[in-house]
């Protein structure tokens, strides 16, 4: 709503831009877009996202880390799935645009996947690349969402093995079909969002706990923070220069990030 028609940047232009960034010392690139897995149908030859990923990794050999932003899991093409499973420089973290774990709500959202699709893709990718970590967007209180539908979303967190949640309480936008549907009461929306966030805290803590005691290669950012390959935040203080790589041993976590 209000976004207009998707426009894809030609593959050659993307490769060229990333190559220039690497020449200037950048070590990681992130592919982003409103609907990243819809890349390519407006370009000659209609390349898909998987082809773009492979082209970047092939033609920019000095790029050390490539990430994908939020993707629609069911739209992941075969080459992209293969790259996720086999390309070490494609980081083992995917943020999925799931939105709900209930089929009826997904249909009313006009999503392109159903609940079982999300579970299947997470299961298959995790089997192909065990270190893969998933995050997801979930909306609480979409119009007509029943208690049962909400519980389906809550269960999806474990069934997909999610470690990071972005939870959004639904708010109507004038002119959209959803705004004309029967609305969930605001106090119910707040309560459901709170429960989803609590679930997010739970699975994040479990993910962080698994990493305590491990050795991690991190890319240092500003503010004394760094990121593991699986996008987990690590507090490294002022021990390392921003933009550098470091190998650190994880000592603990504070529920939100790792510490050394």
Where in the sequence are the language-model features?
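Conserved, mostly hydrophobic/aromatic
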Residues: 14, 31, 68, 96, ...
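Conserved SAM/AdoMet-binding glycine-rich loop
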Residues: 23-147
